[in-house]
Amino acid sequence: MGRKKIQITRIMDERNRQVTFTKRKFGLMKKAYELSVLCDCEIALIIFNSSNKLFQYASTDMDKVLLKYTEYNEPHESRTNSDIVEALNKKEHRGCDSPDPDTSYVLTPHTEEKYKKINEEFDNMMRNHKIAPGLPPQNFSMSVTVPVTSPNALSYTNPGSSLVSPSLAASSTLTDSSMLSPPQTTLHRNVSPGAPQRPPSTGNAGGMLSTTDLTVPNGAGSSPVGNGFVNSRASPNLIGATGANSLGKVMPTKSPPPPGGGNLGMNSRKPDLRVVIPPSSKGMMPPLSEEEELELNTQRISSSQATQPLATPVVSVTTPSLPPQGLVYSAMPTAYNTDYSLTSADLSALQGFNSPGMLSLGQVSAWQQHHLGQAALSSLVAGGQLSQGSNLSINTNQNISIKSEPISPPRDRMTPSGFQQQQQQQQQQQPPPPPQPQPQPPQPQPRQEMGRSPVDSLSSSSSSYDGSDREDPRGDFHSPIVLGRPPNTEDRESPSVKRMRMDAWVT
């Protein structure tokens, strides 16, 4: 906004009048100079102030200009103050340019009133429409971009089948400044006894690391729940430990899965919400098979019919500098433990939800009753491995005795050699099997084999069941905790075959 114009009347204050005279006199002479140079003319100014003091300005020589003036007898333009005021009024009403070359501003009462009205309107607008102060920036420990169509589009709260509280689901909308860090290293679960047992479904799990919809930390002792969050319940008996930077948080998908069995290829599926996992943490999360993934999608879609859909985003989770242990969701406090405990009805709604590292439902109650794992599993949380000489004997419905054998001395992270020593100690306590022809060792797969190597995936295993291998083409994966599968002859393999698989893991 330009300089505020004053009313053109006589200034009553002597000091202000003198200052105004000095400034405007110089301004008038400056304009006269510009006009003389620009338009090639001669200008003479004669000014007498209120005290009759003379001030004059001439573009060349005052006497020369005055001589021309006295000798000039032709008709010419002569203006006074009244002429200037009249010219300004015509300009204001007609909107045309004033023929007056004088640049001094003359404000009429009508013009002054208009300026006052404009100033009042501007002041009222500034008072009524104040700019809201900027919100403080929200600091997160890692970058998670979740574009959604609505702020509450991630809250799936169907009480019949959804097993995740609204507060936990709403925490993924990133509306508060809570620290969003990888999941808890101690994952708990409250499971009601008496639920039917289901063996884990098998299927083709190859190539699922980059497009899987749910990744459960291996050996965490927990199963997937309604919309993909790993359930965090307060059960002191079921304590698992995930590896470094393992992420178990998955958003629900938008489109329902296509009908069919577990042998559908990944190319036939519509692009769902995926978790892009950095390479440093891919090896710690064995993916679900295709059949389990389809069942999980069906359950999530059935539990979220009344909610708003997602915009099919891709969640990028990068954890470049997070410590190996001690990573918890601060947005999932233990205050939700008593409010959202699972019942048998909720568990029966989970049709076929059995991840490779899941505890079957019948044996979970035995874990809760006998209070097992306080020594061995607490060492899992601290170092990601079992302590020396810790034994776990669990009697389940199928009379399977599972023991954890002593392993190599504790390290920061279990190495392939330490895993071989554990397997060799288990094999030494078994009777020697009949000799079998040594099969051709398989060629190591460069990326997918290492993605599911026991270096990371079995760092949290609390027991090793002889015969719990997955029946899938990826024979190099040993499920760390599978208590509900009945042993059969197909699963039992000789130690030589396992030794061959361990050689493939090491590479």
Curated annotation (Swiss-Prot):
Quick one: effect of changing residue 176 to A?
Answer: Abolishes cleavage at sites 1 and 2 by caspase 3. Increased cleavage at site 3 by caspase 3
Q: Do you know which InterPro entries this protein is assigned to?
A: HJURP_C, MEF2-like_N, TF_MADSbox, TF_MADSbox_sf
Q: Where is this region: Required for interaction with MAPKs?
A: 266-283
According to the UniProt entry, which residues carry N6-acetyllysine? Answer: 249, 403
Is Ubl conjugation a UniProt keyword of this protein? Answer: yes
What cellular-component terms does GO give this entry? Answer: chromatin; cytosol; nucleoplasm; nucleus; transcription regulator complex
Positions of region (Beta domain): 289-296
Q: Which CDD domains would you find in this protein's record? A: MADS_MEF2_like
Quaternary assembly: Binds DNA as a homo- or heterodimer. Dimerizes with MEF2D. Interacts with HDAC7. Interacts with PIAS1; the interaction enhances sumoylation. Interacts with HDAC4, HDAC9 and SLC2A4RG. Interacts (via the N-terminal) with MAPK7; the interaction results in the phosphorylation and transcriptional activity of MEF2A.
Pfam families for the chain = HJURP_C, SRF-TF
- Give the lineage: Eukaryota, Metazoa, Chordata, Craniata, Vertebrata
- Report domain MADS-box positions: 3-57
Supply the name of the protein. Myocyte-specific enhancer factor 2A
Covalent crosslink: Glycyl lysine isopeptide (Lys-Gly) (interchain with G-Cter in SUMO): 403
Q: How is it modified after translation?
A: Constitutive phosphorylation on Ser-408 promotes Lys-403 sumoylation thus preventing acetylation at this site. Dephosphorylation on Ser-408 by PPP3CA upon neuron depolarization promotes a switch from sumoylation to acetylation on residue Lys-403 leading to inhibition of dendrite claw differentiation. Phosphorylation on Thr-312 and Thr-319 are the main sites involved in p38 MAPK signaling and activate transcription. Phosphorylated on these sites by MAPK14/p38alpha and MAPK11/p38beta, but not by MAPK13/p38delta nor by MAPK12/p38gamma.
Associated condition reads: Coronary artery disease, autosomal dominant, 1: A common heart disease characterized by reduced or absent blood flow in one or more of the arteries that encircle and supply the heart. Its most important complication is acute myocardial infarction.
Site entry (Cleavage), positions:
176-177, 213-214, 466-467
* Impact upon substituting residue 453 to A: No effect on p38-mediated phosphorylation
Tissue expression summary: Isoform MEF2 and isoform MEFA are expressed only in skeletal and cardiac muscle and in the brain. Isoform RSRFC4 and isoform RSRFC9 are expressed in all tissues examined.
Residues modified to Phosphothreonine: 312, 319, 415
Q: Which family does it belong to?
A: Belongs to the MEF2 family.
List every stretch annotated Disordered: 173-229, 243-270, 397-507
In which broad location class does this protein mainly occur, judging by the first location in its UniProt entry?
nucleus
* Phenotype for residue 255 to D: Decreased MEF2A protein level
Q: What is the effect of changing residue 387 to A?
A: No effect on p38-mediated phosphorylation
Its job: Transcriptional activator which binds specifically to the MEF2 element, 5'-YTA[AT](4)TAR-3', found in numerous muscle-specific genes. Also involved in the activation of numerous growth factor- and stress-induced genes. Mediates cellular functions not only in skeletal and cardiac muscle development, but also in neuronal differentiation and survival. Plays diverse roles in the control of cell growth, survival and apoptosis via p38 MAPK signaling in muscle-specific and/or growth factor-related transcription.
The scientific name of the source species is: Homo sapiens
